[in-house]
């Protein structure tokens, strides 16, 4: 974002672009390093409402320079670049509730694909040869035509990431964690915002306890939203610090991953086979059909003496994280070795 926003200027003394460069982005990078978080950043070329071609290249050198600067720093920090769209007009025809959001509607899948081809050109010009694997739909609205358009233009796409849950009457795109027959996947975001409510955090922890995933989303421009009217930058900054600090304290065993790395984890989660054998001496796990190290949570009152085929890390008085690097994994209890 550019220009001046009174709310930001009055609190920080910075214009909008300097606020993001000098305060917001350093805070994001610091949080990533301090709390062991990886980011997947989503690219958008225009905030216009055009839904009919021709889609002209963005005539904004400052925006292009920002994509270069922020993108390179994101990649350097171990992150990943994905896409949000040519613009913020959800890829859907009429009937998906866009009128309530003030969005334009697309007449055809061909128009959607034409806009995405311009986005692809825009990215290729800045990051030649970079493969795009992740897509997040604007306002969490995505039609079958829009989904097909993304896949047709960005043929390396692996992850569609929208919402985990919501109202049954909503027109948003809700997902479960799954692999699709075309080689793509559904990896929803379970929570969002810089200062989520306790209810939202509780819902995110429910997902985490369900399948071991914490997936959170923030908009850089959230401070501009009507819903953020009573939120200052200081409140939002502290809210994110509190969220990540609590996450690290409670679930410090979580492994940070980008969208593509999450896709690889999901592949193993769905496709791997394993068997478990218990004995007085310990536990044996035999697994197959996996590419990356597997992670299990083991709850036991017993003390682990030795491990072969991987590692074990105590995370609570009666719980361990098991990391399996070999198809044959064995634990022996202390005193039974």
Model-derived features: where do they sit?
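Catalytic grooves of carbohydrate-active enzymes
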Residues: 1, 32, 125-126, 132-134, ...
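The substrate-binding groove and active-site-proximal loops of carbohydrate-active enzymes
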Residues: 2-21, 51-62, 101-110, 131-138, ...
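Metal-dependent polysaccharide deacetylase catalytic core of the NodB/CE4 family, i.e.
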Residues: 33-146, 167, 218-224
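Alpha-helical scaffolding within the catalytic cores
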Residues: 62-72, 167-175, 195-205
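His/Asp/Glu-enriched short active-site or ligand-binding loop at hydrolase and phosphoryl-transfer sites
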Residues: 151-195, 257-258
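Short, well-ordered beta-strand segments enriched in hydrophobic/aromatic residues
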Residues: 276-290
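Surface-exposed beta-strand/loop patches in extracellular or lumenal glycoproteins
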Residues: 286-303, 331
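C-terminal beta-strand-rich structural cap/linker in extracellular carbohydrate-active enzymes
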Residues: 316-337
């Amino acid at each position: 974002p550019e220009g001046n926003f009174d709310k930001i200027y009055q609190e920080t003394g910075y214009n909008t672009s300097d606020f993001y460069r000098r305060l917001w982005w350093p805070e994001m990078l610091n949080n990533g390093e301090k709390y062991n978080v990886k980011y997947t950043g989503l690219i958008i070329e225009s905030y216009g409402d055009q839904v009919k071609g021709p889609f002209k290249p963005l005539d904004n050198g400052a925006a292009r320079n920002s994509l270069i600067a922020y993108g390179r720093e994101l990649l350097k920090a171990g992150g990943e670049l994905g896409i949000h769209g040519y613009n913020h007009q959800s890829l859907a025809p009429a009937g998906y509730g866009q009128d309530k959001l003030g969005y334009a509607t697309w007449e055809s899948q061909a128009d959607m694909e034409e806009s995405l081809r311009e986005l692809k050109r825009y990215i290729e010009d800045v990051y030649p040869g970079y493969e795009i694997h992740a897509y997040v739909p604007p306002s969490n609205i995505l039609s079958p035509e829009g989904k097909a358009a993304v896949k047709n233009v960005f043929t390396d796409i692996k992850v569609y990431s929208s919402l985990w849950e919501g109202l049954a009457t909503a027109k948003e795109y809700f997902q479960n964690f799954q692999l699709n027959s075309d080689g793509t996947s559904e990896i929803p975001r379970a929570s969002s915002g810089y200062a989520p409510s306790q209810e939202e955090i509780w819902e995110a922890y429910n997902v985490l306890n369900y399948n071991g995933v914490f997936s959170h989303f923030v908009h850089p421009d959230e401070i501009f939203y009507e819903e953020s009217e009573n939120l200052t930058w200081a409140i939002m900054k502290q809210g994110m610090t509190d969220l990540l600090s609590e996450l690290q304290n409670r679930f410090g065993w979580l492994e940070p991953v980008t969208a593509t790395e999450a896709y690889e984890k999901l592949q193993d989660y769905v496709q791997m086979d394993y068997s478990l054998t218990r004995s007085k001496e310990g536990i044996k796990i035999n697994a197959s059909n996996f590419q990356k190290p597997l992670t299990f949570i083991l709850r036991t009152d017993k003390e682990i003496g030795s491990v072969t085929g991987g590692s074990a890390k105590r995370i609570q008085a009666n719980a361990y994280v098991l990391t399996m690097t070999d198809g044959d994994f064995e634990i022996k209890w202390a005193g039974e070795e």
